[in-house]
Amino acid sequence: MTMSRARMLPVLGAMTAVLAVLSVAARPAAAQQSAGADTSSLPAGFGTLRQDDIAVKLQYNALQVKVLPLDETVIRTLSPDSYRALHELRESKRAQVDSLLRRTGKPGASLWYVQYFNQEQGEARFSPLEVIIASAGQDFRAVDVYGLTPGFGEQRLQQREMQAGLYVFDPQVDVSQPLTITYETQRSDAWGTLVKKVDRERALIRSRAAGKE
């Protein structure tokens, strides 16, 4: 069920205030990574993929929704500039995410970047809580969502306007496996193909890095 704008904004505002207080505590280990993620053999700076190469896209009425994982094992396959941009974006919310993990007791998180773009004339509304990821037969909604652009909490877009948020999902969302992503009534299984491209790029990265030694 879609949370109404009037209900959602106070909830997110209150949660943000709580997280700000909690963020002074020690940071849990591996808070930003999915369970089992290992980047020790995957150096940064050797990838060649573009952000669109790892993005799942859905069309819902006037909205184009772009969803991509922020897991280090995935974004390290991107070109250096793209990797740096997404890595810094993820790190900008590290304190909030770590505080959320302490509060919920979860061992980690699967972090995702979700972008909404209005391609048509007039105003378009979006529902941040309607993004669902199916992993290993289970459906997951975001544990929390942090706006990355001014006005994200308004949940509306003018023509050609973009809004984006950082989504915190349960660590059981496994980016190394095929996933189904749904927004409202639209769904995509494209990650099953994209993850193969990511796997191939990982192998190439290790080869490139070995050649530099």
Question: Can you say where each PLM-predicted feature lies in the sequence?
Answer:
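Generic detector of short alpha-helix boundary/capping microenvironments
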Residues: 13-19, 102, 155
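Conserved functional micro-motifs across diverse proteins
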Residues: 31-213
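Bacterial N-terminal signal peptides that target proteins for export
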Residues: 2-15
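C-terminal segment of classical bacterial N-terminal signal peptides
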Residues: 19-28
